[in-house]
């Protein structure tokens, strides 16, 4: 449908233009989530994921415009008889599936593992669109144009193959990570200790995360993002997992010796972003894990770090022994905020409903505008904390977060 010489009217031309823009954005969308290291470190996965979402929906809407205009321009023509049209229709169906399951309401109803598997159909859609574009697209006939598009597709495909497949496989084979043992940390929270070879050469820092695939024979291809909950060591790593959903429930039942496939490390909420001076960290639930690793790793002065730890129940507070050690030896101040949620939009528990968000933050750390502020937790909660931090004058360059969820 991208270009029939028999219908060179304005409707057909606009349809072809919409198709070209859609293809451009679709390739950009693929590259944004190809996990190219220098792009990921420059912008962060949370920003790239947001751009990926925007470009994806924009590309899909342009694709729909292309389909509608082509149907109008070529009314009466048997389009299914055109070369590559069956593949194009299959590509459209695959992309519709991806878009529908990416709408927030639908996404909330799906478990991460199932959503991730469905999302992979986007690659099928991109690949199946190729015959349609190059076989009947008149805009693709000039040699220079064909070279550009083949190069763009090759770059996108190569980025995915290198950084999503080859590099993770190479690191997996090189470091040979296996599960050493599993310890409970709190109700519904377990830590997985892993050992491997040459872990001192694994380019990971405290605060980063991997996508983990545990080769236990069940759902092996399903990856889950979990951050390190302790500083990386030359002989061991630790992750801590909240036991919800299929993937994390499997993790809690892993046996020692289970091999692990890793993809990463990802994330830029590390010591590299630390500007120096006092630190205030705010964690909600399992979001404490990367912040605990940073508390061990950052070179803040004695008594210059505060951890605000938000949980629903006292028994959900994890890592008490480590936090007590950090309090005694490095002067870390622990501020537990325990209780059910307050009104929508607040990061405080219901007990503190009389406090405004910004005022509460200032009362915890009066000079917080001069601190590096690290935040990790659910998206809505993190957004509330960021809003309060900006209200009390924390510069954008000192606000750090990593949203590695879906």
Model-derived segments and their meaning:
Residues 15, 169-263, 270, 304, ...:
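Ferredoxin-reductase
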Residues 279-282, 374:
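Conserved beta-strand elements of the Class I
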Residues 124-131, 246-247, 251, 305-406:
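Reductase modules of NAD(P)H-dependent flavoproteins
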